[in-house]
Amino acid sequence: SENNSSIMKDKKGKERFIIIFLDTIPSQEYEDLQITYKINDKNYIIHAIDGGINFPDDFEKCKNKKKEVVIDLENVFTKIKPRNFEGKHNADESGESIHNSTYFDLSDGTVHIWCTLWGDKMNYADGLTVSLRSKNYTNFLQRENSY
């Protein structure tokens, strides 16, 4: 079947990155997979790989699964102390959406694991996301975007 995509723009409206949403197979742990690369990059260098698991209206179950993933990653990144944050999601102006995030800051990128419980007005699926991001893409998101 056909893959979908989304364009990430900077604050000036310039297209910077493209996100490709991949089809998944039922046996995979992650229900949603996506890759991100720069617009017009002829080498298609991947700047992010994301996997998602849906937890509709179940923030506690999501946080329990997130805790398992974080423990697994702590066993991989033994010298990196993760940063944790919980609060309102910037993408929701109503303030109803919340997220619980853990970050592993690497020398050349970030691993970001988070649960989101979206407010009623937001048309997104609640759930867990695990994202491996290049430093370039991490900086773009911090500078230009609400994620």
Where are these regions (language model features)?
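Non-catalytic effector/regulatory segments
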Residues: S1-E15, D72, I80, D92-E93
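An acidic-aromatic pocket/loop used at catalytic or ligand-binding sites
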Residues: N3, D10-D32, E96-Y147
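A sequence-composition feature that detects small, non-aromatic residues
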Residues: S5-S6, A48, A91, A125
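Long, charged/polar, surface-exposed segments that mediate recognition or autoinhibition
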Residues: Y30-D92
